């Protein structure tokens, strides 16, 4: 009688096979190894890309867009005999940036409005503004000057 035919053991599914191949079992091989602190470079996961910060922020010309007035005439309103002409824009087109530099906004203090950005640097050297005088609201007829 011939010896029984040796068959190959059934293969493990691919995920388990990969785990078995990559994870060393040094005890089975007869030697003890401590696991590596860092896997080699090819097995390391790549870092996600970091959002790039701009060294110089964008200038207002790149950020701001011109404010266009709404176009009043549309091609559907035109009569068939009338020749279509380019729409007449009567409003002045301004960039927001230009409008802001012409006149300071209302909410800025008067010091900044009068002296510009240098006023903020000189603000600590100037005397404190006096509180509004209450006697000016009710001027008496006999006194010409206010006590404050």
UniProtKB/Swiss-Prot annotation:
State where composition is biased (Basic residues). Answer: 38-57
The annotated regions of Low complexity compositional bias extend over 1-17
Q: Which UniProt keywords apply?
A: Early protein
A single Pfam family it belongs to is: DUF5451
Q: Domain of life of the organism in this record?
A: Viruses
The Swiss-Prot or TrEMBL record describes its family as follows: Belongs to the Epstein-Barr virus BLLF2 family.
Q: How is this protein named in the record?
A: Uncharacterized protein BLLF2
